[in-house]
């Protein structure tokens, strides 16, 4: 729990560095330090329980925040999207805070040591993390697009990546999220794991949603603004799976 508290503090400081618009390299390094703390917390929990720490809502939310930060660090600098930390850091902070609250006041959940269950849930969480970063890119796209339409470029929009960079990043992240979601489904269905019916329905709908979106992207073409809305909508829809018990 102490490491999670420090992770939350690091997230806030990282957001301040990103929002200041100065020295994005320092902010990126700060987010990397946050990632190290998150990884440490997950390793400690895994050592204590003997399994991947994705047993209850508290651990799942913290693991999700870790995956979002992972994709941010992997793709942020590579695709000139480091500034998306302005959106990513608050999302990580909210997920970490919710994880802490649920961990403090919720009952401890006993998990299973089945490797396939752990792999299934872990890969699915990584899919949601990629979808979360795609949603962040979508929000940034809408902001940048609105600034260009008004021909007014405030300080925040000056820091955002170009429209084409954001659009290309959304396409890549949607594809990554879709492939990871398929991999998670395969791990679950290959071993005939007992999965909640409502959650299965949500995952099937998400798969259809990503499939249709990718078909439009690569076969018919899709305006960037519509793509941004779809990325945000799909991420919100994926979060509904945590509301189902």
Segments from the language model and where they lie:
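Conserved small/polar residues in nucleotide/adenosyl-binding loops
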Residues: 1-5
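Juxtamembrane boundary at the C-terminal end of a transmembrane helix
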Residues: 240-245
